[in-house]
Design a protein with these regions (language model features):
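Membrane-embedded segments
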Residues: 63-119
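Hydrophobic membrane-insertion alpha-helices, especially the h-region
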Residues: 10-26
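Short extracytoplasmic
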Residues: 42-70
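C-terminal functional extensions of proteins
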Residues: 3, 196-269
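Structural recognition of alpha->loop->beta junctions
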Residues: 101-128, 211-229
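Short glycine-rich or small-residue beta-strand-to-loop segments that form or flank ligand, phosphate
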Residues: 54-61, 86-90, 169
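Alpha-helical transmembrane signal-anchor/signal-peptide segments
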Residues: 30-47
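Membrane-proximal low-complexity regions enriched in glycine and acidic/polar residues
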Residues: 115-199, 203
């Protein structure tokens, strides 16, 4: 038993590497039932009539891409499939490229036209000040879009003057922007808000769910996988759940087995 306690850590790393690689090669899907938190966002979007306006804030950067980009893509598929007009923006300077590529690629897949069915406003610094400005007049906050076009005559923004005119707003965040959207957006201008975040932030968002300040929550890769399942379009998030789940099981086994060996060795001594 003492030999097992002194096992080379490189052997453990090899087991973890195998636990990641083998599920990717075999490509098996684990069941991903949707939780009520994720279903809250799905049901809200599904209830919107055609032609509704939805704002998606891509408030994350490439460091959080693996968790949040699948959420963004799944949301966009749902919106474009339901003929909802999408307005994108970001309060994170690292999110512009990710947001633009996601909106453009998914929009083309559904034959949607830029300025007619969707628009990307781009990045603006200020966070809370930007939200307050958008709450008063969106054209004052973003007189031009990401590509330099004037926003005042865009069909995708017809009927939208401020945040209050959006039928739904979703913030995808790798930082503290969700709290800002609640305090300086929803509570001040009274619109429906949903949220997506990295797994490490997820537990901090549940009080906002319980207080009904957000309609729903997608947390981490699991949240993205649940949304992919709901829209019946399994992609990178669902594929990533298999290796993640196997690694989690392996780590739990190592912890239990290591503690068992430690106590058994102590009893012998």
């Amino acid at each position: 038993m003492e030999r097992l306690l002194r096992v080379d850590r490189r052997i453990l790393f090899a087991f973890v590497a195998a636990a990641v690689t083998i599920p990717l090669l075999i490509k098996f899907d684990l069941p991903v039932p949707a939780t009520k938190e994720v279903r809250g966002i799905y049901d809200k979007i599904d209830s919107l009539p055609e032609g509704s306006h939805m704002l998606i804030a891509f408030d994350y950067d490439p460091a959080s891409k693996e968790e949040l980009q699948p959420m963004a893509v799944a949301l966009l598929h749902h919106c474009f499939k339901n003929n909802i007009k999408v307005v994108g923006m970001t309060l994170n300077p690292g999110g512009t490229g990710l947001a633009d590529s996601a909106i453009t690629e998914v929009g083309k897949e559904y034959g949607r036209e830029y300025k007619e069915d969707y628009v990307f406003l781009g990045y603006k610094t200020g966070v809370e000040l930007v939200m307050i400005n958008m709450g008063e007049n969106i054209y004052s906050a973003f007189p031009k879009d990401f590509k330099g076009n004037s926003t005042t005559d865009m069909p995708a923004l017809n009927g939208v003057q401020s945040l209050q005119d959006f039928d739904f707003v979703v913030d995808l965040a790798s930082g503290s922007s969700i709290e800002a959207w609640i305090a300086f957006g929803k509570e001040k201008y009274n619109f429906d808000l949903g949220a997506g975040c990295t797994a490490v932030i997820g537990p901090d968002m549940y009080p906002f769910l319980q207080s009904k300040q957000i309609e729903g929550l997608m947390s981490g890769l699991k949240g993205a996988a649940e949304y992919e399942t709901l829209i019946n379009r399994k992609s990178s998030a669902v594929a990533g759940m298999s290796p993640q789940s196997v690694v989690h099981v392996l780590v739990v086994f190592f912890v239990i087995f290591g503690n068992f060996l430690y106590f058994m060795t102590g009893r012998k001594k």
